[in-house]
Structures are given as C-alpha cells and as structure tokens.
C-alpha cells in the first residue's frame, strides 16, 4: 500500500499530465477573454466534441449564452465508448430522453436542449475518433459554406491537446483556440486519490489515469506515435521533460494504466 508521501507524488504527477493535456488558451470562454488574447470578441465557430464527460454540455451552453462564436457545432458519432456514455447520461439525467442508438452529438444536443433550452446550429454525427472528428467537422463547415478562420475546440481535458494538434494538421489555415471541458486537480484524501471537485460525469480516478497515460505515447513524435514521424495523424507536439518524467514515474507505479486503442476507432 502506498504511503501518504508516495500518493502525494502520484497526485503531483497526475496533475502535471493533466495541466499539459487539458489546455485552455483563455481563462474563461467570454468575449472579453477572447478579445484580450486574440483581438476579437468572437470566434467563427465553436465545436464541442464527443468523448468529453457530460460537463462539456454545460461548457457549450455557457459559451452560447456568452456569445463567443458565430456558429456552434456538436461533433461525435458512435464509437467504442458511446454505449458507456449513454449509460452514464441515463444514470446522471434519468429524465433525459434520447434514442437507444443515439450518437454522442445527439446525446449532448438533447442534454443542452433539456437542461439549458439551447440548440447548437449543427450536429456532426458520423465521426468515430478524434481524427475524423476534425476532418468531418471541416467538411461539414465547407459544405454549409460557413466561414471558419478561428475555431474554439472543446474536448475532454485528457484529449484536448491531441485535438488541437489534429486541427493544426487538418485545418492549417484556421486559428485553433483550446478550451478543455473541465479543469480538475487530484489531491490525496483519506489515503486515496480524489478530486478537488468533480464535474458532471467525471471519470473515476483509475479511468482518468488511464486516459491521461494513454495520451503521451500518442503525442510523442516517434515511429510509434501519431505525429509526423509516426502515423502522421497530428502536427508535431513538443513534450516537456517534466511531463515525460511524470509519465515515467506513473508508469512504473501503475503499469496497468496504459490502455490500448481499439483499432476500429484509432486516430
């Protein structure tokens, strides 16, 4: 059993990974924050991506009320985690109705409508991984003639940096603005890892760890990663030594934490 001191080191390392992966380019999604950073109070498009915990729906709704974009899109078909997401949403929102085969975009749309009385402009319901989340979004915007020179990308914090790297490769003329759907810190409480606060639908700590750990090899630009030197899915990502060190220590302590991607939904 890990000592309190060892768990505190684990918490620090988890938070290092989380801070690196869960990027937010502005402190809040408001016109003022965008204007201070980019010189414009609105982006052309904001996209919420399936794969996020349910709290992403609240982030989108808050952004819509604030008016941070001209067009709002929810992106996400049905992938290998969608049934788990459906079950989680039914548990959290038993009065929310959606079809048994609903895509993640449709589920988020139902949630935003039911809880906030709001509706996104477009749904993209065919993509099944981060890679075609971006390419299908790009193609949908082009098909509808929607200008997109600036794009707010809002994804689960564990996958936010990957989403931005995908957009940099597939939409090179577009300014990506990252805003992860949540920001949490892991602490030690009663001899266990715990969250400082838990957003709606938050992963349990073991699942959160596997999601964080699985991202670093993907982002590593070598023959095994998703970057230009590997599978070619992403733009190059620099991984700081501090992040690499935290990942190495966590892997040594929790070798089970490395998840394997389902090849049907890789990307």
What role is predicted for each listed range?
Residues 187-255:
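A conserved mid-domain beta-alpha-beta active-site/ligand-binding segment of alpha/beta enzyme cores
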Residues 1-202, 208, 257-267:
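A structural signal for short, hydrophobic/glycine-enriched beta-strand patches
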């Amino acid at each position: 059993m890990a000592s309190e001191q060892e768990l505190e080191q684990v918490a620090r390392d988890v938070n290092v990974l989380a801070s690196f992966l869960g990027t937010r380019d502005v402190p809040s999604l408001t016109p003022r924050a965008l204007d201070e950073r980019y010189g414009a109070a609105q982006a052309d498009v904001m996209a919420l991506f399936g794969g996020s915990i349910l709290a992403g729906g609240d982030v989108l709704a808050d952004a819509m009320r604030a008016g941070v974009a001209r067009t709002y899109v929810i992106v996400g078909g049905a992938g290998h985690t969608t049934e788990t997401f459906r079950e989680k949403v039914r548990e959290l929102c038993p009065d929310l109705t959606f079809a048994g085969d609903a895509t993640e975009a449709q589920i988020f749309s139902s949630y935003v409508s039911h809880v906030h009385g709001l509706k996104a402009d477009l749904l993209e319901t065919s993509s099944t991984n981060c890679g075609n989340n971006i390419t299908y979004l790009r193609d949908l915007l082009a098909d509808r003639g929607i200008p997109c020179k600036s794009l707010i990308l809002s994804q689960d914090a564990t996958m936010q940096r990957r989403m931005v790297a995908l957009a940099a490769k597939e939409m090179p003329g577009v300014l990506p603005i990252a805003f992860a759907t949540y920001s949490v810190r892991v602490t030690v409480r009663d001899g266990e890892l715990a969250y400082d606060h838990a957003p709606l639908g938050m992963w349990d700590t073991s699942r959160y760890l596997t999601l964080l750990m699985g991202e670093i090899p993907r982002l590593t630009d070598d023959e095994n990663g998703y970057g230009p030197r590997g599978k070619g899915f992403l733009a190059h990502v620099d991984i700081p030594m501090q992040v690499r060190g935290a990942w190495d220590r966590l892997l040594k302590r929790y070798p089970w934490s490395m998840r394997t991607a389902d090849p049907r939904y890789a990307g």
